[in-house]
Swiss-Prot record:
Residues the entry annotates as binding substrate: T200, V201
Activity regulation as described: Inhibited by coumarins, sulfonamide derivatives such as acetazolamide (AZA) and Foscarnet (phosphonoformate trisodium salt).
UniProt keywords, alphabetically: Lyase, Metal-binding, Zinc
Tissue: Expressed in spleen, lung, kidney, heart, brain, skeletal muscle and testis.
Function description: Reversible hydration of carbon dioxide.
Sequence similarity: Belongs to the alpha-carbonic anhydrase family.
Active site: H65 (proton donor/acceptor)
Organism encoding this protein: Mus musculus (Mouse)
UniProt protein name: Carbonic anhydrase 13
Keyword Lyase: yes
Residues noted as binding Zn(2+) in the record, renumbered to the chain: H95, H97, H120
EC number, as in UniProt: 4.2.1.1
Classification of source organism: Eukaryota, Metazoa, Chordata, Craniata, Vertebrata
Keyword Cell inner membrane annotated: no
Gene that encodes the chain: Ca13
Length: 262
């Protein structure tokens, strides 16, 4: 398997990632199954403080592994603070994970329940590190907000994204995408679970403070089908759809999951 060819297929999927990225078998890998009976409420966890500047959204691209919406992270325009975090974490990008059918697709699992999809909003510690790339190698470098998507009502907040997918259908395509506030994709309750973990895609670096929101948002079956119409192949290659892009839960290995709520 060539270094750049990891994916979600039979021959390059998550069970093969350790061949190129040995940390795949590390002690702080993500995602995990959250077992609510084993979670501890922690009264020291603060509420989340989130301020995003819609004008800092820049481009949407097809990485071949998902779509990414990238933000201008040259200054603290869009930041996540509070919760389990110390200092400011600057918004870098968000992307989505889904499955080949509506009954699975989320990366984190809660008491055996798999949601249809999972949004990841990625931030980096701009108080301590000069760039995302450097922060990604430090244990307190990244903070990822995870939001579950559950099949239900059509979600108008996703429309701007689904409407533009045709212009980034092939891997490597990108287009301008601005005036978007990811806050509109968060549920009304910001109750969360938190634990130390990793990126869920290679290079799988163990530098993430995970903040997984308990309350899901809705997505219709038709909207979710739009994401499966993206290709994991570039223009000129034999076309293959990105039907599924989620990593299964990894062993907890003694880590503690804390809750901000009873």
């Amino acid at each position: 398997m060539a270094r750049l060819s990891w994916g979600y297929g039979e021959h390059n999927g998550p069970i093969h990632w350790n061949e190129l990225f040995p940390i795949a078998d590390g002690d702080q890998q993500s995602p995990i199954e959250i077992k609510t009976k084993e979670v501890k409420y922690d009264s020291s966890l603060r509420p989340l403080s989130i301020k995003y500047d819609p004008a800092s959204a820049k481009i949407i691209s097809n990485s071949g592994h998902s779509f990414n919406v990238d933000f201008d992270d040259t200054e603290d325009k869009s930041v996540l603070r509070g919760g389990p975090l110390t200092g400011n974490y600057r918004l870098r990008q968000f992307h989505l994970h889904w499955g080949s059918a509506d009954d699975h697709g989320s990366e984190h699992v809660v008491d055996g329940v798999r949601y249809a999809a999972e949004l990841h909003v990625v931030h980096w510690n701009s108080d301590k590190y000069p760039s995302f790339v450097e922060a990604a190698h430090e244990s307190d470098g990244l903070a990822v907000l995870g939001v579950f998507l559950q099949i239900g009502e059509h979600n108008p907040q996703l429309q701007k994204i689904t409407d533009i997918l045709d212009s980034i259908k092939e891997k490597g395509k990108q287009t301008r995408f601005t005036n978007f506030d990811p806050l509109c994709l968060l549920p009304s309750s910001w109750d969360y679970w938190t634990y130390p973990g990793s990126l869920t895609v290679p290079p799988l670096l163990e530098s993430v403070t995970w903040i997984v929101l308990k309350q899901p948002i809705s997505i219709s079956s038709q909207q979710l089908a739009r994401f499966r119409s993206l290709l994991c192949t570039a223009e000129g290659e034999s076309a293959a759809f990105l039907l599924s892009n989620h990593r299964p839960p990894q062993p907890l290995k003694g880590r503690r999951v804390r809750a901000s709520f009873y």
